[in-house]
């Protein structure tokens, strides 16, 4: 889509804010040095910049990329994608790109039985299943399954199970 003058102005102002914060923190990875609520606040903005390939400076793009790779961001996104909306709120009539964040492991909803008897998150008995690389894993509810379906590598508890040899 064509970036409007107003959007260019908003992006320039955003970069002015970010650059000031980086300067104050000594040009660390996050706005004020360590990851903070300021970074959490700008996470959805970073996602929009990435999805619509909005024109930003190299430093701003590095900050956006840092968000996309951050475990908390990946988990937040995965949990959000477990809910489907019809109609989709705030749908914009412009082209976007496939998710530019880290590539995920291909997964699909499956039937049991599973390699594991308890959910990697809660420790509860499994009732819902997911297939990855020909292996079936169990979860205690559809939400635990679906957040893992979206981005398995965002979840250390699951990856610990996934990295073990098949039982």
What are these language model-derived features?
Residues 1-74, 79, 106, 110-114:
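GST-like fold's C-terminal all-alpha helical module
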Residues 145-162:
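Short metal-binding segments enriched for Cys and/or His
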Residues 124-125, 142-143, 147:
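Cys/His-rich metal-chelating microdomains
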Residues 81-109:
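Acidic/histidine-enriched, glycine/proline-rich intrinsically disordered or flexible terminal extensions
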Residues 116, 127, 134-137:
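Residues immediately within or flanking Cys/His clusters that coordinate Zn2+
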Residues 101-111, 126-128, 165:
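Short, intrinsically disordered, charge-biased short linear motifs at domain edges
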Residues 119-123, 130-131:
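Short cysteine-rich clusters marking metal-coordination/redox-active sites
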Residues 120, 138, 142:
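Cys/His/Pro-rich metal-binding microdomains
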